[in-house]
Amino acid sequence: MRTHDDTWDIRTSVGATAVMVAAARAVETSKPEPLIRDPYARMLVTNANAGVIWEAMLDQEMVAKVEAIDAETAATVEHMRSYQAVRTNFFDTYFADAVAAGIRQVVILASGLDSRAYRLDWPAGTTVYEIDQPQVLAYKSATLAENGVTPAAERREVAIDLRQDWPSALRAAGFDPSARTAWLAEGLLMYLPAEAQDRLFTQIGELSCAGSRIAAETAGNHADERREQMRERFRKVAQTLGLEQTIDVHELIYHDPDRAPLGQWLNEHGWRANAQNACDEMHRVGRWVEGVPMADDKQAYSDFVTAERL
């Protein structure tokens, strides 16, 4: 059960979800024609010791094993992996467009095991700020450093919970509010109460000059129903395969029916926003997977929101 002041490392609570996402990136990277390439994802997963079920996600044969038990769950596993690749690609492209427009200041909120500071081609003079729990940032930077991996940009850690005074910590790390910034909130908002989400974007607005950009992933209105269907199927399959589930992602999420649609909120608070539905984006890049629950309901899937400060 979440509390207002809970903390975590890479093996527990919200921190462990970063391992799951990194596992999906690792699987995608190993494909013959990957949509994205994250050469550090597998390393970050295997060194985390976050639980058997997360490492099992690295298994290329996992979908076939699950399919032998339940075809719809197998499709859902493949869809989840594909979704993570599409989401990563969308936001990689967002950053590429931002730096092409001359932006040299980047902030990744709740960065988890995001390795963009290491794997993307950043122009000279780019600074990437990563905000997350201290133990999560420490694990990532230590693991990569121990394996001889160095950042491709100036990387600065801001080790603080987003429920604390992170704007002051960000400024103390060298952030310049007068410079255009590209912000990212990927895989974050579902773990915040509605009030905290509004406060977060209010704070971002206060730190963003005209021409700054933001990108975020938001859940659809019917996402809870789809997640519940997936949860029950995953639980049954995990039991059959003998995989222990160390966390229940469903219990980490804030189920807030009054959460304001992010695109609308941004348009009303000094930004010009657009939203791309995840289903449409998966179809656009040829990575949609058939046979998943609620496939005909776009509101059961995420939106990728991008906006520019006016």
Curated annotation (Swiss-Prot):
Keyword tags: Methyltransferase, S-adenosyl-L-methionine, Transferase
Record-linked Gene3D superfamilies: Vaccinia Virus protein VP39
One annotated GO molecular function: methyltransferase activity
Matches recorded under InterPro entries: Ppm1/Ppm2/Tcmp (IPR007213), SAM-dependent_MTases_sf (IPR029063), SAM_mthyl_Trfase_ML2640-like (IPR011610)
Record-linked PANTHER family: S-ADENOSYL-L-METHIONINE-DEPENDENT METHYLTRANSFERASE YKTD-RELATED, S-ADENOSYL-L-METHIONINE-DEPENDENT METHYLTRANSFERASES SUPERFAMILY PROTEIN
Function description: Exhibits S-adenosyl-L-methionine-dependent methyltransferase activity.
Record-stated family: Belongs to the UPF0677 family.
Protein name, UniProt field: Putative S-adenosyl-L-methionine-dependent methyltransferase MUL_4762
